[in-house]
């Protein structure tokens, strides 16, 4: 395939919900990701199309403990935690992540910066995946958090 290995990371993603609106119904996400001693606060807006998980994302490096304290003080509350091992590769202008998500299993995630034509970028990604034997129809738009919460609900 020719993909270049970029390393392995352990991610601990803690998601928060708003006291004013329910992110699960507005299709938004707010998380603090801890990776290798660094923490990043990320806000993800609503998905932009009906076939991919493309959405606006804004992130900034933070002190994890301070960011948690600020969110809690503002009334935000923890909505779930996702723990995963991520093996990263780069191929052309794509980032490929082989994820092993605790309690869920194995996944492949392919990203490309979509500063311009989203449809064109999606076509490139789906073409790449088809080369690996993964059909467009097999792709999922459900987030790891949604899957973790659904699995938790099924257990109760």
Q: Predicted regions span which residues?
A:
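A structural signal for short, well-ordered beta-strand segments
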Residues: 58, 110-112
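N-terminal strand-loop-strand beta-hairpin
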Residues: 1-93, 132-156
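Short beta-strand/turn micro-motifs at beta-sheet edges
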Residues: 96-98
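Residues forming anionic-ligand binding surfaces in small-molecule and nucleic-acid pockets
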Residues: 101-109
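Short, surface-exposed beta-strand-loop junctions and turns on beta-sheet-rich folds
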Residues: 47-50, 104, 116
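Short beta->alpha junction loops/turns
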Residues: 63, 113-115
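Mixed-charge, glycine-accented linear interaction segment located at domain edges/termini
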Residues: 116-141
């Amino acid at each position: 395939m020719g993909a270049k290995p970029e390393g392995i990371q352990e991610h601990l993603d803690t998601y928060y919900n708003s006291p004013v609106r329910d992110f699960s119904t507005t299709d938004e996400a707010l998380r603090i990701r801890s990776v290798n001693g660094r923490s990043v606060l990320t806000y993800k807006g609503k998905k932009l199309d009906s076939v991919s998980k493309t959405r606006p994302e804004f992130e900034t490096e933070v002190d994890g403990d301070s960011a948690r304290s600020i969110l809690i003080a503002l009334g935000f509350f923890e909505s779930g935690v996702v723990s995963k091992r991520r093996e990263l590769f780069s191929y052309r202008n794509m980032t490929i992540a082989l994820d092993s998500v605790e309690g869920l299993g194995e996944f492949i995630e392919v990203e490309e910066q979509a500063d311009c034509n989203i449809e064109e970028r999606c076509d490139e990604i789906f073409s790449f995946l088809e080369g690996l034997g993964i059909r467009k129809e097999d792709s999922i738009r459900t987030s790891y958090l949604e899957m973790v919460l659904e699995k938790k609900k099924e257990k109760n």
